[in-house]
Amino acid sequence: MSKTPERLVTSEVRDEDMTEASLRPLTLADFTGQAAARQNLSVFIAAAKARREALDHVLFVGPPGLGKTTLAQIVARELGVNFRSTSGPVIAKAGDLAAQLTALEERDVLFIDEIHRLNPAVEEILYPAMEDFQLDLIIGEGPGARSVKIDLARFTLVGATTRAGLLTTPLRDRFGIPIRLEFYTIEELERIVLRGARVQGLALEKEGANEIAKRARGTPRIAGRLLRRVRDFAIVDGVESVTRTLADKALSLLDVDPIGLDQMDRRYLNVIALSFGGGPVGIETIAAALSEPRDAIEDIIEPYLIQQGFLQRTPRGRLLTPHAFRHLGLKEPVRETPQYGLFPDQSEED
């Protein structure tokens, strides 16, 4: 079975993204976009420093690639404390979490990415750690088992998730500072691209940066990746400065259209449009038709299509909008007006 080729515009982390740490902003003042989140964080951080206390636990919610990890690092840097990072799937058992927590010093920041994927048994251990700064561990087995309490330094837990709905209510309620991150505007992405070009020593015209920003799907991680690919074309073509024309040529050859859709997006839209009459159709059916996992569709493909007005999630399934048919150059089918609010179809898998 052939392996699905990697998508250029996926917001998932790829190896090349990890090598560009120097492009990341180091302070809230340097961070572009997410104005409300930055303003609130600056107030909470200043207040915590003035009280000489640990910052309340923070939860970042939003699609991949919007800066959750970067903001977590900035929080630690602005507080002047140590930063430790892990992820939900890595913490397999209570001992793994205990090792992380007992290594923390006063007011340190522990970042848990994909916190919605924590083992339920580990999550139970996390509750008293977040609330009372204590670890309740069971030592031994059977009749000889005993409970041991370990005092922890007062720390800040920063969680990140793309699936807030999968968090249990007890865990979600223990975060005093919930922050939702939004997709970036083209203007914000343009500034990010221009900054990245300066760091890389690449001459980039403003119009060229705008062309890259328009195709970056509202996501800085994708903008950085597109910039690197355009840079490759500039080097091979031997041009001194990246213009809009060069950026358009490079990204068109890479099959990224003027609004950032790629072959996978168009395949998704075409499956619903041509195979299922524009919908509504259930997510499991779409996943089977595309031979893609449901999580990847919900986390990576759909958020941008919804944000662009191409797709609706309804009680009966996924439904393409007239805007999607116009973009695909297809005629919209005549559909009966759905009475979603009256008789919701309980068979939808969402």
From Swiss-Prot:
DNA binds at residues 294, 313, 318. The keyword DNA damage applies. Mg(2+) binds at residue 69. One of its GO terms (cellular component) is Holliday junction resolvase complex. GO terms for molecular function: ATP binding; ATP hydrolysis activity; four-way junction DNA binding; four-way junction helicase activity. Residues 1-184 are annotated as: Large ATPase domain (RuvB-L). Its EC number is 3.6.4.-. Its main location: cytoplasm. Residues 185-255 are annotated as: Small ATPAse domain (RuvB-S). It catalyses: ATP + H2O = ADP + phosphate + H(+). SUPFAM superfamilies: P-loop containing nucleoside triphosphate hydrolases (SSF52540), Winged helix' DNA-binding domain (SSF46785). It is found in: Cytoplasm. CDD domains: AAA. It holds the Pfam family RuvB_N. Keywords: ATP-binding, Cytoplasm, DNA damage, DNA recombination, DNA repair, DNA-binding, Hydrolase, Nucleotide-binding. Residues 258-350 are annotated as: Head domain (RuvB-H). InterPro entries: AAA+_ATPase (IPR003593), AAA_lid_4 (IPR041445), CbxX/CfxQ (IPR000641), DNA_helicase_Holl-junc_RuvB (IPR004605), P-loop_NTPase (IPR027417), RuvB-like_N (IPR008824), RuvB_C (IPR008823), WH-like_DNA-bd_sf (IPR036388). Has 3 domains, the large (RuvB-L) and small ATPase (RuvB-S) domains and the C-terminal head (RuvB-H) domain. The head domain binds DNA, while the ATPase domains jointly bind ATP, ADP or are empty depending on the state of the subunit in the translocation cycle. During a single DNA translocation step the structure of each domain remains the same, but their relative positions change. The RuvA-RuvB-RuvC complex processes Holliday junction (HJ) DNA during genetic recombination and DNA repair, while the RuvA-RuvB complex plays an important role in the rescue of blocked DNA replication forks via replication fork reversal (RFR). RuvA specifically binds to HJ cruciform DNA, conferring on it an open structure. The RuvB hexamer acts as an ATP-dependent pump, pulling dsDNA into and through the RuvAB complex. RuvB forms 2 homohexamers on either side of HJ DNA bound by 1 or 2 RuvA tetramers; 4 subunits per hexamer contact DNA at a time. This is Holliday junction branch migration complex subunit RuvB. The gene is ruvB.
